């Protein structure tokens, strides 16, 4: 819906996205003490969640909120992004050993129940709040809907539905102190079950989200976390050259499904676009080669969910419909579109065209469930190619890149090039480089590129018109 707004300016789409994110971020579906979003709400107010927290939900929300923040600069979204990433780095990290220098990845989920009761870990009563917060309890209770009878089965789910807008810096600091005190007490409760499996596909989603958020908000720790999780999957979840689906306590299980390759390849491409490190692009190309060999349907096009070598499936399914996570075929459409632009290899475009032909449908009710695929169609046809030429350590190069990162261009494909690095011969910016010895940025749509931009402010203005 946000992409639809960015493409055609539909204000109703924009309003729907902003309203939904605002209500979710104020409601009880959000963990106001620990950060992170629960799996879903059971009511129309986003008040009462199913208290289970999933890695994939939070990864997808971080990515979406980052993209929306690029345009709106919403303080609420920036706060929720930071809090959610802080939660993931505090509570979801899985390491292979006790060595703090080892790469880490992310666990799958926290259960909803503790001590046999759903939500018990998360809810409060008024007496607890009064006892713990003392003189500051009245202010806290007025912000978080706390009253004697509770708002859920006699208990209180903390929420800011009545006060969704952030207050002054001083007001928020006072509330933060109170939340921190409550969080310390909550941490001593019996925790919900932690599902510490590392799933390649879900980690791919989080790597992509952390990479984007880390560069947009200039948070090196987030980007390093993305690199760590990527390294974990590449080194600990690959057996005999092939990716596996799960890792737990040193044990690999299950041959990778399409979603594993699709999401990890997208993660590699995202890391390449945001760091300029070609080793990520090389790995993306290698993974797509494996995916084409093991999952591509040579007869009809598109990708099967399971590998050709899989022996434990009755039939090989193929779907483009998004569920709680993006469809593997939808993600691969975006992967192919990006790799075609980044490398100039026409095989990627040919496969994307075959998928377009296979999955295109005039039935609008079918297309509603294929939004990731539709985004891939748009990217293939109307990508905004941004090329920044300059030495990576040059402050002027960094300023141009930061402008790109903080500007909302959902269809962008970014290439960071040193002055002597070549572009594919068919790339519209082929042969372009520094201007008067200074770093420069080029914006290309189709076969046409804009005049070079050396000034970050001018680049931001040019990007706003794409």
Locate the predicted segments by residue:
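Glycan-recognition and catalytic cores of secretory/periplasmic carbohydrate-active enzymes
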Residues: 1-466
């Amino acid at each position: 819906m946000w992409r639809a707004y960015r493409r055609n300016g539909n204000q109703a789409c924009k309003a729907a996205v902003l309203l939904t994110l605002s209500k979710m971020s104020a409601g009880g579906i959000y963990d106001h003490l620990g950060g992170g979003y629960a799996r879903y709400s059971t009511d129309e107010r986003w008040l009462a969640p199913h208290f289970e927290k999933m890695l994939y939900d939070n990864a997808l929300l971080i990515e979406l909120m980052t993209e929306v923040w690029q345009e709106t600069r919403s303080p609420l979204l920036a706060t929720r992004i930071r809090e959610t990433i802080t939660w993931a780095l505090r509570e979801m990290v899985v390491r292979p050993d006790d060595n703090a220098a080892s790469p880490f990845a992310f666990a799958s989920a926290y259960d909803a129940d503790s001590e046999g009761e759903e939500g018990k870990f998360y809810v409060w009563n008024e007496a607890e709040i009064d006892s713990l917060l003392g003189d500051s309890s009245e202010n806290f209770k007025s912000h978080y809907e706390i009253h004697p009878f509770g708002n859920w089965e006699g208990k209180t789910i903390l929420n800011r539905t009545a006060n969704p807008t952030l207050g002054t810096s001083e007001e928020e600091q006072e509330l933060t102190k109170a939340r921190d005190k409550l969080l310390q007490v909550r941490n001593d409760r019996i925790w919900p079950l932690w599902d510490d499996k590392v799933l390649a596909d879900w980690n791919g989603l989080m790597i992509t989200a952390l990479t984007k958020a880390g560069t947009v908000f200039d948070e090196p720790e987030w980007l390093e976390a993305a690199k760590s999780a990527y390294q974990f999957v590449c080194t600990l979840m690959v057996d005999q050259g092939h990716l596996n689906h799960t890792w737990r306590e040193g044990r690999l299980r299950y041959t990778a499904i399409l979603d594993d390759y699709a999401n990890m390849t997208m993660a590699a491409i995202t890391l390449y676009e945001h760091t300029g490190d070609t080793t990520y692009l090389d790995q993306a190309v290698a993974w797509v080669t494996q995916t084409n060999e093991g999952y591509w349907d040579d007869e009809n096009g598109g990708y099967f969910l399971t590998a050709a070598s899989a022996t434990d499936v009755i039939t090989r399914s193929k779907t483009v419909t998004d569920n709680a996570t993006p469809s593997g075929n939808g993600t691969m459409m975006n992967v192919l579109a990006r790799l075609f632009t980044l490398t100039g290899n026409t095989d990627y475009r040919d496969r994307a065209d075959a998928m377009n032909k296979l999955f295109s449908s005039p039935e609008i009710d079918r297309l509603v469930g294929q939004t990731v695929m539709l985004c891939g169609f748009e990217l293939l046809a109307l990508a905004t190619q941004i090329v920044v030429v300059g030495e990576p350590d040059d402050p002027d190069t960094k300023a141009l890149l930061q402008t790109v990162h903080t500007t909302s261009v959902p269809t962008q494909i970014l290439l960071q090039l040193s002055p002597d690095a070549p572009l594919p011969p068919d790339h519209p910016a082929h042969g372009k480089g520094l201007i008067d010895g200074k770093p420069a940025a080029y914006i290309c749509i189709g076969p046409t590129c804009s005049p070079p931009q050396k000034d970050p402010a001018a680049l931001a203005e040019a990007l706003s018109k794409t």
